[in-house]
């Protein structure tokens, strides 16, 4: 018999309602959300979901014997503090990214979890991005030969974001907020690099948020570059991959986020998150002197 997992949430904002609940609701036979805590729960703008208990009393959630796992989705600066409370209450914990503001904080939490025999993990849904999964499929096909270079881009034109922030905070920076998606993809697939080089900038000047980063990770002869900016009026391709025998370009990012923003939900639509053929990546390679160019069907992403 398959045990139903009973979980609770600390936080009731965009992360809980856009990135967690739609996928939990497709697995009602396996996962039950019992309680959602938020300090301002009675003023939250998100629609309440039937069958879930909403509370502004944290102890009610932490002391509930039925709840096995708690997901922390509060603002980044509160992740460490609340993950610690969850572990101290004897519950398994999943923490939204960025996980913590320092290595020391993260290590303390993992040590605490281990000492109590608890599972602690960071919520890394971006490992299940369709573009990233498709790049893996292309690499594993061997058609590119030895890999030389991988460029990953996560671009926006949102100058109003850095312009509205007038003080520097590590955990609220663009590097922590967005490189946690792309860097996790690199390290989860390629492992720990031989060495790394980073260029992180504050384009609006000292004391402001970092709003640009360019990170290079080296694996033998392979160089992986992770680049991002808030000031790119035309975004660069999501992935460009070069090997000794060819290249693969995937221009469009994973569709799941766009569908979720439009309330096009996975439990209502079988084509949720699916690319159209126009968005498929292009593979170009040399096979014994013959030029090949083909579209690669996108692997379905699944948060």
Language-model segment annotations:
Residues 177, 183-266:
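Contiguous beta-strand/loop segments that form the cofactor/metal-binding neighborhood of enzyme cores
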Residues 50-112:
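Beta-loop-alpha module in the N-terminal Rossmann-like domain of NAD(P)-dependent dehydrogenases
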Residues 245-303:
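C-terminal glycine/acidic-rich active-site capping loop/insertion
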Residues 56, 95, 120-122, 151, ...:
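Hydrophobic residues in well-ordered beta-strands that form the structural core
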Residues 108-125, 146-150:
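Rossmann-fold dehydrogenase core element
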């Amino acid at each position: 018999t398959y045990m139903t997992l009973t979980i609770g949430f600390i936080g009731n904002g965009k992360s809980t309602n856009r990135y967690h609940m739609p996928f939990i609701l497709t697995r009602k036979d396996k996962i039950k959300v019992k309680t959602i805590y938020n300090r301002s729960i009675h003023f939250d703008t998100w629609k309440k979901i039937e069958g879930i208990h909403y509370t502004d009393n944290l102890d009610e959630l932490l002391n509930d014997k039925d709840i096995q796992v708690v997901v922390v989705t509060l603002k980044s600066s509160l992740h460490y503090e609340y993950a610690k409370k969850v572990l101290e209450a004897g519950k398994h914990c999943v923490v939204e990214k960025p996980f913590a503001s320092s290595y020391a904080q993260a290590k303390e939490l993992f040590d605490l979890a281990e000492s109590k025999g608890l599972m602690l993990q960071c919520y890394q849904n971006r490992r299940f991005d369709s573009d990233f999964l498709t790049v893996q499929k292309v690499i594993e096909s061997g058609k590119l030969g030895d890999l030389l270079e991988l460029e990953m881009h996560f671009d926006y034109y949102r100058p109003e974001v850095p312009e509205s922030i007038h003080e520097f905070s590590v955990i609220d920076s663009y590097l922590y907020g967005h490189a946690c998606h792309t860097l996790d993809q690199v390290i989860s697939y390629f492992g720990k690099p031989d060495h790394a080089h980073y260029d992180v900038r504050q384009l609006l000047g000292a004391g402001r948020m970092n709003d640009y980063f360019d990170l290079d990770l080296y694996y033998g002869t392979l160089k992986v570059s992770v680049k991002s900016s808030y000031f790119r009026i035309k975004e660069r391709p999501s992935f460009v991959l070069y090997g000794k025998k060819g290249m693969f370009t995937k221009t469009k990012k994973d569709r799941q986020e766009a569908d979720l923003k439009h309330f096009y939900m996975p439990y209502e639509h079988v084509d949720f998150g699916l690319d159209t053929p126009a968005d498929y990546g292009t593979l170009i390679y040399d096979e014994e002197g013959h030029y090949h160019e083909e579209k690669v069907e996108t692997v379905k992403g699944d948060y």
